Amino acid sequence: LEVAQSTFVLDQPQGLDTPVAQGGTNFSGGQRQRLAIARALMKHADLYIFDDSFSALDFKTDAALRHALQGETCDAAVLIIAQRISTILHADQIVVLKDGEIVGLGTHDELMETCEVYRAIAESQMKGGE
């Protein structure tokens, strides 16, 4: 729970025994995402796929969670699918897709130099406060 920034569960009246309503409606979107990540980490897998798993998190929680995940997933491959540049900023390799086609491959710095699509997204998000 701690790695996934999900200690809010312990503050629930029933703690870890708190029932999850159909569709998780008794938790916020960010809380549901953190619970899903905590469940995934319980398996100690060789591969983790996080498909837009950080989108409902505020930037501070997103950064703290990604930092904590580094230690927890150091012996595994991690694939993060994201629209928010800050979520993938420090990835070893970023694949940029446009209309289902790969239009860029590299690190953030490399893509800022070589990939117009990536650069446009990054600049747009920086202007928007992300």
Q: What does each model-found stretch correspond to?
A:
Residues 1-19, 44, 60, 117-120:
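Conserved "ABC signature" C-loop
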Residues 13-15, 60, 67, 71, ...:
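C-terminal portion of ABC ATPase nucleotide-binding domains
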Residues 35, 40-43:
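Hydrophobic/aromatic position at a conserved helix-loop-beta junction
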Residues 42-46, 75:
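A short, proline-enriched helix->beta-strand linker immediately N-terminal to the Walker B motif
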Residues 48-52:
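Catalytic Walker B motif of ABC-type/P-loop ATPase nucleotide-binding domains
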Residues 55-57:
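ABC ATPase nucleotide-binding domain "signature" loop
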Residues 75-83:
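Conserved H-loop
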